[in-house]
């Protein structure tokens, strides 16, 4: 097993751990889930660039008759990228004392101000940071509003 294979295995394990945490552990942390709202995906161009680079690496490895293990590891990495970029949907998860946004726990008492932009983006102002929540379905903004009013 070469250094390249070890690095690929480490990346695959890290992506698997992230996917497992995002799908199974995070919804169970910090109490019962009151609402989970799917968000719009960001970074489509980044996903295509990453997939293209992986395709180039797989092609080069096959054409130069590289190690079969490396080819398989690159294919597994491509499958993980496909899951993370195209199948998994980002979401905001509301709990009784706070919410998860981009896998970060934010308590409700940290919210200083909330606004809704004209294009349907919920802007949540924290102490030193602004969160831009772009929901997939515009009707979910009303559900978010009801949860915020109920829990505050």
UniProtKB/Swiss-Prot annotation:
This is UPF0266 membrane protein Ent638_2389. It is found in: Cell inner membrane. Belongs to the UPF0266 family. GO terms for cellular component: plasma membrane. Keywords: Cell inner membrane, Cell membrane, Membrane, Transmembrane, Transmembrane helix. It is a multi-pass membrane protein. It holds the Pfam family DUF986. Coiled coil: none annotated. InterPro entries: DUF986. The chain crosses the membrane at residues 6-26, 45-65, 67-87. It comes from the Bacteria.
């Amino acid at each position: 097993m070469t250094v390249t294979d070890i690095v690929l295995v480490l990346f695959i394990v890290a992506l698997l751990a992230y996917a497992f945490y995002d799908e199974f552990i995070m919804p169970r942390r910090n109490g019962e889930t009151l609402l989970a709202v799917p968000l719009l995906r960001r970074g489509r161009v980044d996903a295509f660039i990453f997939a293209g680079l992986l395709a180039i690496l797989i092609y080069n490895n096959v054409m130069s008759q590289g190690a079969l293990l490396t080819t398989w590891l690159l294919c597994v990495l491509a499958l993980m990228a496909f899951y993370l970029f195209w199948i998994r949907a980002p979401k905001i998860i509301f709990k009784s004392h706070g919410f998860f946004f981009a896998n970060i726990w934010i308590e409700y008492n940290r919210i200083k101000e909330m606004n809704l932009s004209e294009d349907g983006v919920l802007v949540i102002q924290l102490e030193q940071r602004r969160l831009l929540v772009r929901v997939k379905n515009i009707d979910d903004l009303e559900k978010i509003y009801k949860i915020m009013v109920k829990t505050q």
